[in-house]
Structure formats: structure tokens, C-alpha cells
Swiss-Prot record:
Native organism: Neisseria meningitidis serogroup A / serotype 4A (strain DSM 15465 / Z2491)
Gene Ontology CC entries for this record: plasma membrane; proton-transporting ATP synthase complex
Protein name: ATP synthase epsilon chain
Keywords: ATP synthesis, Cell inner membrane, Cell membrane, CF(1), Hydrogen ion transport, Ion transport, Membrane, Transport
Similarity comment: family membership: Belongs to the ATPase epsilon chain family.
Record's subunit section: F-type ATPases have 2 components, CF(1) - the catalytic core - and CF(0) - the membrane proton channel. CF(1) has five subunits: alpha(3), beta(3), gamma(1), delta(1), epsilon(1). CF(0) has three main subunits: a, b and c.
Keyword check for Metal-binding: no
Top-level taxon of the source organism: Bacteria
The keyword Transport is assigned to this record: yes
Location(s), subcellular: Cell inner membrane
Functional summary from the UniProt entry: Produces ATP from ADP in the presence of a proton gradient across the membrane.
Main location: membrane
Length: 140
């Protein structure tokens, strides 16, 4: 079975680095499924659930992403995400609370920097909620 190297990195940390047999990335054009030896492309990442199929793993590795850039080479996929969180680190109640706090931050922003930070936090919370919804809807 063919494999490819995958790197998922946020501005704060490396989220995933390893091999995968398939990856689905939410892009501005829609979800993009990538197998090893894919044609080289670049795309903008939109918020949603990034899904990795790892050889020998029963479940997909799920990462909530909100924005960023995708680079695909035949043997390597790199995702530079604005915000990325592994599904194991997510919690529904915390994500909902973060969404409410970000929405309040948007309405109370005093300047452009505060507004941008609140929008980034809102996107991260929505990405986590979408990923948690995906997990719930695909439980076996």
C-alpha cells in the first residue's frame, strides 16, 4: 500500500507529523481527498475537519482546522493551518463557550486587532464544533 508523509502545523505547534494512506482536507473549493502520488497542487484551507487515514489505525485521525494553506506533492502533504486542534483535545462544552466568548469579543472589539483576534477565535471554535459533529455523525 502506498503511503505519503503528512505534516499538519499551526502557528503554535506541530499537530501531526507522520505517514498516511489518505487525507481529506477542507479547502475553499470543497473537501479535497488526497492519495499518495497525487498531482502537485496548492489550495487555501477553510475551517472544518481534516481527516487522516493512517496505516494500522482503526480510526481516522481528526484535526479541526480554521484557515491556512495546503501544499500537495506526490509523496508529501503539508498543511499550514492558522489554527489546528486534534480531536482528542476537543470538548463540546469548551468549544461552545469559546464560540460565545468570541462572538462577544466581536461585538465588543475596540480596535481592528481585537476584532481580528475575536474572528480567529470564532473560526477556531466553529472548526472544533464541526469536527465534533463529524465525530458524532460517524460513530459506529
Amino acid at each position: 500500500m502506498s503511503i505519503m508523509q503528512v505534516e499538519v502545523v499551526s502557528s503554535e505547534q506541530k499537530i501531526y507529523s507522520g505517514e498516511a494512506t489518505f487525507i481529506v482536507v477542507p479547502t475553499v473549493q470543497g473537501e479535497l481527498g488526497i492519495y499518495p502520488r497525487h498531482e502537485p497542487i496548492m489550495s487555501l484551507v477553510r475551517l472544518g475537519a481534516l481527516r487522516l487515514t493512517v496505516l494500522g489505525e482503526d480510526k481516522e485521525v481528526l484535526v479541526a482546522v480554521s484557515g491556512g494553506v495546503l501544499e500537495v506533492q506526490p509523496d508529501k502533504v503539508t498543511v499550514l493551518a492558522d489554527v489546528a486542534v486534534r480531536s482528542a483535545e476537543m470538548d463540546q462544552a469548551r468549544a461552545e463557550e469559546a464560540k460565545k466568548a468570541a462572538e462577544a469579543g466581536i461585538s465588543q472589539a475596540k480596535d481592528d486587532k481585537a476584532l481580528a483576534e475575536a474572528h480567529k477565535a470564532l473560526a477556531a471554535a466553529i472548526a472544533q464544533l464541526k469536527t465534533l459533529d463529524y465525530i458524532r455523525s460517524h460513530k459506529k
